[in-house]
Structures are given as structure tokens and as C-alpha cells.
């Protein structure tokens, strides 16, 4: 038993850590790292473990709160009434179990007859960003995001720009009214926004929710004002001081209210009608009442049929006990009300014919099989292409050209091929064969051992990788070409002026000045920066080539060991593995890179343009040679890059994690877990002054 309890505790800790990481990505950065279905599965597993082992429940568990802490860029707002999440259901059995619990509780409280079923108010689960609007004496005074449910971000200035949000309520408004609702963007308006963003060469959004969240959380309200945001109210928080009619039907809509609330209506539906009378937008298109589990499931099925025709995205429906006195009796658990349930839709699926499998070359050379499909309507859009991820996935799913396949919009965003439909494979179906050469540049395609991704080896030559290669090469840690950024590289490549790294060195100020957002002074400065990059250190040049697995430190070590680019190009794997800290994986990567004729050709072109790397300087002394440093926190004067350069110049190494092999940890302000780890292992800890003294700077 002790062993099982220990295993449960370990799994609970792992789940909490993973869920919190996903929460930060979803709630704070608006950049979800997993699909809703994957997140829900993790949360359900954690809930079950905590149910089985109640001694493991802690106030910090993700099951006891919602989301993640807000960013520091906005002011914080403490919710007087917590903005709780909802429990989820994924199948009819869970909906029926919810209905039974509600009915049993209300019958026990005398609010339902034995032969009577609960009445519910059913709504769409809008896929946007939850916010709370605070009105005082009818005037909008504050708007906040959900945040972690207890504390959100102050987005008042941005919300005031949303035309659907009234700045002053109509009629006799209460002294205090908190309105909860969803900010979202219609699909048609989302498409127009993305077309406009693309035309201005600005970031396009992944989906309407991402666009709505990103628009609402802009630091500049003027940007928010230009975005087609909508708002629908669906609930409330604090309600105090109703003029002329004081009732106490509902003491607190959730734990934490500052004083007793008074509401004008006794059902959830009637409260939404009241909010609409005050001038707040309420989504009434599909809202309706239903009785018992049978009514709930009928609503769910009807909305599922009508979902593709909706102007906005939804990811489920919401059921709420309609009677407010009944809601009060049912109450809350730590993170969700007992009187409400979200019934989620599965990722939408459809079947179609797989016409072909082609390969797509990514910006880093990754080769991805892409299914070309007979057009099919899935998840509100027409899908003609879908990812197959990698060669192993194609084999595992046994997908063949000519198959009838199931297509799913994973997470309602990214179309993917789930697999073939059993029994519908034609006699002439063909297996996919990974090409041996890149379809873009003709360079060899190789798949390193123990890796799922095949890659084009023509990094410096391949047009598909050109922009990313140039951006990396121009970086501060590589050739350090100041002024050569992403948008300028886009212009140079798209116009055909630059087809390889060597072409940069033939640019002149006259042709640069003709580009968009480039004047004579900027062009002159860029040409000067390119000229300075004709004599980089050998380590910088090697790093600039973008060889897989070769980072800044490895490039410097290899450069010091071999002394010239020619020696590195001609070294075999055994010789390369003889360089400091170069194992077989890195040695193989370097060897494959220079075995590709196109890459060797680029080196020759660089030489022809007058690029002559200088030998890498050796360490200034050998007292720190081979010593490993870890940097954590913020130093008063040096940046991390500056500290790293000084350490490397002294022969030391810089690592990202603390271990028994770490010689020194340099800790600045707000040092985190790395400092604690160093103290635990007895590693020497230095501040900035201590580091400078050690380096003799």
C-alpha cells in the first residue's frame, strides 16, 4: 500500500507540474501547447487521483484554482467574487450523472418533488477570452481578465474600445454590478483581419480565439480599437444596491463576495434578460430551457448539427440549473459550481479521399509529409491539406495514397489525418516513399538515427531554408550584422537579390536604399556592418552556418581545435569527435553538412566575396579552462551575453543547468531554482563582483 501511495504522490506531482505549464501557455501567453482534449485528459486524471487519495489534495493544486498568474505588464485586479471554471462532461453518461446529482440534492432540500426533474438554462460555450466588467452607478469603471480566477489583469482601457460593451448602462442600474462574459471575434472578421495583417507584412493569427485574446491584451489600446472584437454577457459577480427593489434570493454567487448580494430575478434566464434590459449584449440565438438529462442531450445534439453555420467558434455547450435559489443550495466546490456543467464537443472529424502525399520543407530543413485531400468541410472550414507529421506516423497509421481517410481538426485548429477508414482501401492504393532528395533544392535528405524527422542537408543552399539561415547568420552571436533583420531579409530574398549567404557581401548601398523603409543612411550603415563581417572569428563563422547541433560554444571549441575552415571541412567523424566536448552526434552532423556539395560551394563563394575568418583566440589563461558556469537571475551591470563572453574568453563553459560538474553558479537578483540547486549540491555561488574578480576583469 505504501508503494502505491508513493506512486500516486509522484504521479500527482508530475501532473500538477505539467498542467501548470500548460496553464501558463494558455491563460498567460495565449499560446496553448496541447489540444483541449489532451489538457482535459490530464486534469481528469489528476481529479481522479485526488479523489482516490484525498490526503494529496493541496490548496496549490490546479484542481483548486483556474489558470495562471497574470503578466506584470498590466495592473492586477482582485476579483471580489472568484471567476471559477466549470466542470466538464464528454459523453452522455457524465451528463446523466450530473443531472442525477442535481436532482437528488434538490429533492433532499425540498426544492423538487419526487416525480419532478430539474430545469436547466442551456447556452453555447463561446471560444474566446473570459472577462469581468465592473459597473458602479451604471458606469463602466473596470474590466479584468479571468487570470487565475482570484486575480486578473486590468484591461479597462482596451475593453472601453469594444463597441459592444456599453460604457453606461440603461435604466435603473444597481450601485455595483459585475458582469461576466466572453470577448470573441467572428470567423469572417477574423479572416479579414488576417488578410489585412498579411498585406502589411505583420503577424497573422492562428484562430479567432488567439486573435481575440491577443487583441484584448495589447499594451496599446489604439491597436485594440482597430480589432473587430465582440462581447457577450453570460453571468454576473457582485450585485449590490438595486434601486427600488431589494431581494435576497442569492446571498453569494460564489465564495468570496464582500457583502450580501441582491438580485432582481429568481432564475438564470431572467437574470440574462435583465442584463439585456440594461443594454448589455446577451447571446440569445441558442439559449433555451431544458428539463432533465434528456433535454440537455437534445440541446447538445441540435447545437452540434448547427455548429458549422455559426458565425463564431464554440467548443461546447453549458448547462446551468435555472433556479437561483436552487443554485444557492447546490453551491460550489473549490474550482467550479455544482449547479453548472460544460459539455465539450470532440474534435470535429470527417472522411474524404487521400489524393497524394507530398513533402513540405520547413524553415529549418525539416521534411514533413503532407496529405493532399479531396476538399472536405471540417470544423467550420474547407480542408484540402492535412499534416501527417513524419514518416513514422505515416507507417504507424498505415495511410496510403488513394485511401478514404478520417480527417480531424485537432484542437479545432490544425487539420490532421487520423487514419484510413477500414474496408475502403482500393486495390491500387500506394504506400508513401520518402524522397531521397529535397524537392526544393535537390540536396540529399537524411534522417539521423534516433530522430523522427528527416531533414534537407542543403541548409545554405535550399530556398525553403534561406530566410531562416540568413536571419541566424546575421545574429549577434554569429556574424553580428547590425541592421539586418527579419523584414529586410524577407525583402532581399523575395526580390531575388539574395539567394545565399554569400550574396549578402555583394550588396551595395544604392540598391539597399531603394528597399522599403531603407534610406541612404540606413543603407550605408548596413553595408558597413556587412564589411565588418568579412573577417569574423572562425567560431562565429562556423556558428553562422547553422549546422544542426552546433551551438555557439561548440563552434568556438571546434574552431580552436582545428584552426581553419578548410581543416574542419576535410575532417572525418573520428577527427571531429576528437575536439573538446564533441560527441558522435555533433561530429556526424558536421560531417554530413560539409559532405553536401552545395554547402561546400557556399563556402567557396564566401571566400570569393572576401570573407576570411580569423583563427579563434585561445583562452586568456588556463586557470578556468574547462570549468562550467551557470548563470541565473539578473546582474546589476553585465547582461548574460556579456558575462558569457568573458567566461568563454577565459576558457570556461556556460551551461543552462546545475549539476555536480558545475564549478560556479553566478547569481543575480531574482535567482530561482538554480541557486537553490547549487546550495543543495555545495556549488560555489558568486555574484557579479565575485565573477569579475575571478576573471580578473
From Swiss-Prot:
PROSITE patterns: BRCT, DNA_LIGASE_N1, DNA_LIGASE_N2
Enzyme category, top tier: ligase
Cofactor(s) demanded: Mg(2+); Mn(2+)
Gene Ontology molecular function: any one: metal ion binding
SUPFAM superfamilies to which the protein is assigned, alphabetical: BRCT domain, DNA ligase/mRNA capping enzyme, catalytic domain, Nucleic acid-binding proteins, RuvA domain 2-like
BP GO annotations: DNA repair; DNA replication
Binding residue positions for Zn(2+): 438, 441, 456, 462
Pfam families: BRCT, DNA_ligase_aden, DNA_ligase_OB, DNA_ligase_ZBD, HHH_2, HHH_5, Nlig-Ia
Entry keyword annotation includes Flavoprotein: no
EC number: 6.5.1.2
One cellular component (GO) term of this entry: cytosol
Catalyzed reactions per annotation: NAD(+) + (deoxyribonucleotide)n-3'-hydroxyl + 5'-phospho-(deoxyribonucleotide)m = (deoxyribonucleotide)n+m + AMP + beta-nicotinamide D-nucleotide
Residue intervals of the BRCT domain: 619-697
Entry similarity comment: Belongs to the NAD-dependent DNA ligase family. LigA subfamily.
Function: DNA ligase that catalyzes the formation of phosphodiester linkages between 5'-phosphoryl and 3'-hydroxyl groups in double-stranded DNA using NAD as a coenzyme and as the energy source for the reaction. It is essential for DNA replication and repair of damaged DNA.
HAMAP family named among the record's database cross-references: DNA_ligase_A (MF_01588)
Name of the protein this chain belongs to: DNA ligase
Organism the protein comes from: Bordetella petrii (strain ATCC BAA-461 / DSM 12804 / CCUG 43448)
Amino acid at each position: 500500500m505504501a508503494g502505491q501511495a508513493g506512486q500516486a504522490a509522484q504521479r500527482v506531482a508530475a501532473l500538477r507540474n505539467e498542467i501548470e505549464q500548460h496553464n501558463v501557455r494558455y491563460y498567460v501567453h495565449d499560446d496553448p501547447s496541447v489540444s483541449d482534449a489532451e489538457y482535459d485528459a490530464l486534469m481528469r486524471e489528476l481529479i481522479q487521483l485526488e479523489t482516490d487519495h484525498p490526503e494529496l489534495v493541496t490548496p496549490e493544486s490546479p484542481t483548486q484554482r483556474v489558470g495562471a498568474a497574470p503578466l506584470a505588464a498590466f495592473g492586477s485586479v482582485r476579483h471580489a467574487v472568484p471567476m471559477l471554471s466549470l466542470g466538464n462532461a464528454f459523453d452522455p453518461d457524465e451528463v446523466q450523472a450530473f443531472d442525477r446529482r442535481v436532482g437528488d440534492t434538490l429533492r433532499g432540500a425540498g426544492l423538487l418533488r419526487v416525480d419532478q426533474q430539474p430545469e436547466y438554462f442551456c447556452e453555447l460555450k463561446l471560444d474566446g477570452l473570459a472577462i469581468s466588467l465592473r459597473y458602479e452607478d451604471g458606469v463602466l469603471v473596470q474590466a479584468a481578465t479571468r487570470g487565475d480566477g482570484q486575480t486578473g489583469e486590468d484591461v479597462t482601457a482596451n475593453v472601453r474600445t469594444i463597441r459592444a460593451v456599453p460604457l453606461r448602462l440603461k435604466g435603473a442600474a444597481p450601485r455595483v454590478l459585475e458582469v461576466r462574459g466572453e470577448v470573441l471575434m467572428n470567423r469572417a472578421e477574423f479572416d479579414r483581419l488576417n488578410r489585412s495583417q498579411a498585406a502589411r507584412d505583420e503577424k497573422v493569427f492562428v484562430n479567432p480565439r488567439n486573435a481575440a485574446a491577443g487583441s484584448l491584451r495589447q499594451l496599446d489600446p489604439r491597436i485594440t480599437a482597430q480589432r473587430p472584437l465582440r462581447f457577450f454577457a453570460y453571468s454576473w459577480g457582485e450585485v449590490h444596491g438595486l434601486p427600488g427593489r431589494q431581494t435576497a434570493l442569492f446571498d453569494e454567487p460564489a465564495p468570496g463576495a464582500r457583502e450580501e448580494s441582491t438580485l432582481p430575478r429568481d432564475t438564470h434566464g431572467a437574470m440574462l434578460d435583465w442584463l439585456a434590459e440594461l443594454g448589455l449584449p446577451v447571446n440569445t440565438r441558442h439559449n433555451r430551457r431544458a428539463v432533465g438529462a434528456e433535454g440537455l442531450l437534445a440541446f447538445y445534439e441540435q447545437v452540434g448539427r448547427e455548429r458549422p453555420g455559426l458565425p463564431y467558434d464554440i467548443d461546447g455547450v453549458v448547462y446551468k440549473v435555472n433556479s437561483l435559489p436552487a443554485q444557492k443550495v447546490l453551491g460550489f466546490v473549490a474550482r467550479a459550481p455544482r449547479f453548472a456543467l460544460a459539455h465539450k464537443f470532440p474534435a470535429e472529424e470527417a472522411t474524404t479521399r487521400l489524393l497524394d502525399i507530398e513533402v513540405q520543407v520547413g524553415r529549418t530543413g525539416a521534411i514533413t509529409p503532407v496529405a493532399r485531400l479531396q476538399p472536405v468541410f471540417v470544423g467550420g472550414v474547407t480542408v484540402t491539406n492535412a499534416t501527417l507529421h513524419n514518416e513514422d506516423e505515416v507507417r504507424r497509421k498505415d495511410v496510403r495514397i488513394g485511401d478514404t481517410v478520417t480527417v480531424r481538426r485537432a484542437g479545432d485548429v490544425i487539420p490532421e489525418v487520423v487514419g484510413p477508414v477500414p474496408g475502403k482501401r482500393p486495390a491500387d492504393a500506394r504506400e508513401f516513399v520518402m524522397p531521397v532528395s529535397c524537392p526544393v533544392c535537390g540536396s540529399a535528405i537524411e534522417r539521423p538515427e534516433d530522430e523522427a524527422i528527416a531533414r534537407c542537408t542543403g541548409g545554405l543552399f535550399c530556398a525553403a531554408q534561406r530566410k531562416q539561415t540568413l536571419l541566424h547568420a546575421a545574429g549577434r552571436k554569429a556574424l553580428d550584422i547590425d541592421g539586418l533583420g527579419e523584414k529586410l531579409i524577407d525583402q532581399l530574398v523575395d526580390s531575388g537579390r539574395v539567394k545565399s549567404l554569400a550574396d549578402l557581401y555583394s550588396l551595395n548601398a544604392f540598391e539597399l536604399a531603394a528597399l522599403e523603409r531603407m534610406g541612404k543612411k540606413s543603407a550605408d550603415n548596413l553595408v558597413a556592418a556587412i564589411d565588418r563581417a568579412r573577417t569574423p572569428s572562425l567560431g562565429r563563422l562556423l556558428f553562422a552556418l547553422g549546422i544542426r547541433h552546433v551551438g555557439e560554444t561548440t563552434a568556438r571549441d571546434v574552431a580552436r581545435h582545428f584552426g581553419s575552415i578548410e581543416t574542419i571541412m576535410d575532417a572525418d567523424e573520428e577527427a571531429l569527435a576528437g575536439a573538446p566536448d564533441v560527441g558522435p552526434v555533433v561530429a556526424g552532423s558536421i560531417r554530413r553538412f560539409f559532405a553536401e556539395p552545395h554547402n561546400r560551394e557556399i563556402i567557396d563563394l564566401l571566400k570569393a566575396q572576401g570573407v576570411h575568418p580569423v583563427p579563434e583566440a585561445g583562452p586568456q589563461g588556463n586557470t578556468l579552462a574547462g570549468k562550467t558556469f551557470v548563470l541565473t537571475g539578473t546582474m546589476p551591470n553585465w547582461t548574460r551575453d556579456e558575462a558569457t563572453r568573458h567566461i568563454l574568453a577565459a576558457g570556461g563553459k556556460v551551461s543552462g543547468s546545475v549539476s555536480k560538474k558545475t564549478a560556479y553558479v553566478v547569481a543575480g537578483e531574482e535567482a530561482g531554482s538554480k541557486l537553490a540547486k547549487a546550495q543543495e549540491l555545495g556549488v560555489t555561488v558568486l555574484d557579479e563582483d565575485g565573477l569579475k574578480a575571478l576573471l580578473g576583469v
